[in-house]
UniProtKB/Swiss-Prot annotation:
Biological or metabolic pathway of the protein: Porphyrin-containing compound metabolism; protoporphyrin-IX biosynthesis; 5-aminolevulinate from L-glutamyl-tRNA(Glu): step 1/2
Pfam families documented for this protein: GlutR_dimer, GlutR_N, Shikimate_DH
Species of origin: Polaromonas sp. (strain JS666 / ATCC BAA-500)
The protein's name: Glutamyl-tRNA reductase
Its EC number(s): 1.2.1.70
Record-annotated active site: 51 (nucleophile)
Encoding gene per record: hemA
Top-rank taxon: Bacteria
Alphabetical list of Gene3D superfamilies matching this protein: Glutamyl-tRNA reductase, N-terminal domain (3.30.460.30), NAD(P)-binding Rossmann-like Domain (3.40.50.720)
Alphabetized SUPFAM superfamilies for the sequence: Glutamyl tRNA-reductase catalytic, N-terminal domain, Glutamyl tRNA-reductase dimerization domain, NAD(P)-binding Rossmann-fold domains
Length: 426
């Protein structure tokens, strides 16, 4: 059995390509089922999908990796060649190291950001619900969580990091002289919007509103900030009222189109509008960026802002890598032991078969009236002969070099490390 990972992220693939492989949390379970059903031998599998990465982790036959890449490409509506040119594949210790780095926030656009750990835990729960988790991936991810916890408690990897939400506020502050004078609209009601609303609320804007597909969830979030709630359907007619728009939904298609923004610009009489699209795939049509008086930023545009202070945390990164190295070694040791389980089961089955055969033979001898000492002698001799037959045959086979190697192995196994005695010519 092999552990491997297939993925693409913000460093290997552009935003629009990542958008083709973005899966909402409620899509992970059916997606994993579809993947596993497409394979002859269903591997253990987990799917992690965030705005910056989509990754599949599997434990099974490594030969399934190419099929998985083709399956994923088909799902995303692109050619395998295109996906292959932007994807990475990792096996065993490299896959484990990557999982540990992802969980610890070392592979994130925002170095040390804590949200990825929660997203990874959600992905594991979804895989469990899909019946796709097994003992190997369970070990991998439980160890990932433990390593991430140690990294965060033992290093300053998350110190002074700037989240996407905080970066949005910082950029808005560069456009507007006083954030207390602006009206802010948040589209969506998920974790990212929650964070963004928290950061903007700290600047006490003139007003805040939340537009969401379901009013109930929008109202729950709005109540914390004293914000207005509106329906997504009302967005086009009210867009012009807001100076800043922060959007992050799970929609597979843009929900703010070029036409709606053009109308808003005219109604605003060309006052600037600040827009941040934190969604993958996009919530705001990319052509909006070309409109006058519109300042649109995507998650990739925010990269240079969130990198601030990264150089100052390189010492923490080095400390984290040491912790991760130890975690990888421990996992690979466990995996190596795990790979011997089938052999151990085979050996136990074989010795049980020998034991049963010798017991049956002993019972026949007893029934014939043979002395008990003779029966026990025959029983033990039969067992030892069966156990040693393979080793003795190997010692007599092959050339001198192979016989010497076999002799040392047999000595280690049967003589508890005593060196084999050298043959003396008479």
């Amino acid at each position: 059995m092999s552990v491997w990972a297939l993925g693409l992220n913000h460093t290997t693939a552009p935003l629009d390509l990542r958008g083709r492989f973005a899966y909402a949390l409620d899509q992970i379970e059916p997606t994993l089922r579809g993947l596993r059903e497409s394979l002859a031998r269903q591997p253990e599998a987990t799917l992690l999908s965030t705005c910056n990465r989509t990754e599949i982790y599997c434990a099974g036959d490594h030969n399934d990796l190419e099929h998985t890449l083709e399956w994923l490409a088909h799902n995303g509506g692109v050619s395998p060649a295109l996906l292959r040119s932007h994807a990475y594949t990792l096996q065993d210790d490299q896959a484990a190291r990557h999982a540990f780095r992802v969980a610890s926030g070392l592979d994130s656009m925002v170095l040390g950001e804590p949200q990825i750990l929660g997203q990874l835990k959600d992905a594991v729960r979804a895989a469990e619900d899909a019946g796709a988790m097994g003992s190997t991936l369970h070990q991998l991810f439980q160890r990932s969580f433990a390593v991430a916890k140690e990294v965060r408690t033992s290093t300053e990897i998350g110190a002074h990091s700037i989240s996407m939400a905080a970066a949005s506020v910082r950029l808005a502050g560069q456009l507007f002289e006083n954030l207390g004078d602006i009206r802010v609209l948040f589209v969506g009601a998920g974790e990212m919007i929650d964070l963004a609303a928290t950061h903007f609320a700290a600047k006490t804007p003139k007003s805040m509103a939340i537009a969401n597909r379901t009013l109930e969830r929008g109202e729950k979030l709005a109540s914390r900030f004293g914000a207005e709630v509106m329906r997504l359907a009302d967005l086009p007619s009210r867009l012009h009222e807001f100076d800043a728009v922060i959007s992050c939904t799970a929609s597979t298609l843009p929900i703010i189109g070029l036409g709606a923004v053009e109308r808003a610009v005219k109604l605003r009489k060309h006052r600037p509008m600040f827009m941040v699209d934190l969604a993958v795939p996009r919530d705001i049509e990319p052509e909006v960026k070309d409109l006058p008086d519109i300042y649109l930023y995507t998650v990739d545009d925010l990269a240079h802002v969130v990198q601030t202070g990264k150089d100052n945390r390189q010492a923490a990164v080095a400390q984290a890598e040491v912790i991760i190295d130890a975690g990888v070694q421990n996992f690979m040791h466990w995996l190596g032991q795990r790979r011997t389980v089938p052999l151990i089961q085979q050996l136990n089955a074989q010795t049980d078969e020998w034991r049963a055969a010798e017991i049956a033979r002993a019972k026949k001898l007893i029934a014939k009236g043979e002395p008990m000492d003779a029966v026990l002698d025959a029983l033990t001799r039969g067992l030892t002969q069966k156990m040693l037959h393979g080793a003795l045959a190997e010692l007599h086979a092959g050339d001198a070099a192979s016989r010497e190697a076999t002799a040392h192995t047999v000595s280690r196994l049967f003589l508890r490390g005593q060196p084999p005695k050298e043959h003396k010519e008479r």
